[in-house]
């Protein structure tokens, strides 16, 4: 949890000088492609996938959390964390995956 908040602080510091529209220009379609490549081994990332190999939340459950924001998820993906492999995602890729997860919030 400490790493999660550290990631949020890093994200806020990195984007503090940017206006809201340019802080994260995310591409949800690209995020879906990345999620299928990097995340689908452990997470259920879309409706076509019925099962994952780890006991982790599906992306729909992440999207529906009351405190979900794409910014929080993107920051979490950038910062190394012990519960998940540390994928070499760029800030743009993390934002794209977070934007895709946001599309699942219904």
Positions of the model-derived regions?
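C-terminal capping alpha-helices of c-type cytochrome domains
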Residues: 88-106
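An amphipathic alpha-helix signature
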Residues: 70-78, 95-98
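Bacterial N-terminal signal peptides that target proteins for export
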Residues: 1-11
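The canonical Cys-X-X-Cys-His
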Residues: 36-45, 97
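Gly/Gly-Pro-rich "capping" loops immediately C-terminal to redox-active cysteine motifs
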Residues: 47-74
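N-terminal secretory signal peptides
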Residues: 29-33, 41, 51
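Electrostatic cytochrome c docking/interface patches
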Residues: 16-34
């Amino acid at each position: 949890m400490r790493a999660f908040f550290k990631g949020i602080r890093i994200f806020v510091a990195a984007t503090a000088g940017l206006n809201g529209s340019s802080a994260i220009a995310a591409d949800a379609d690209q995020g879906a492609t990345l999620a299928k490549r990097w995340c689908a081994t452990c997470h259920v990332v879309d409706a076509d996938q019925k099962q994952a190999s780890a006991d982790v939340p599906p992306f729909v459950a992440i999207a529906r959390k009351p405190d979900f924001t794409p910014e929080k998820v993107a920051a979490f993906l950038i910062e190394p964390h012990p519960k998940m492999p540390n994928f070499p995602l760029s800030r743009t890729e993390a934002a794209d995956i977070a934007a895709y997860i946001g599309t699942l919030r219904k």
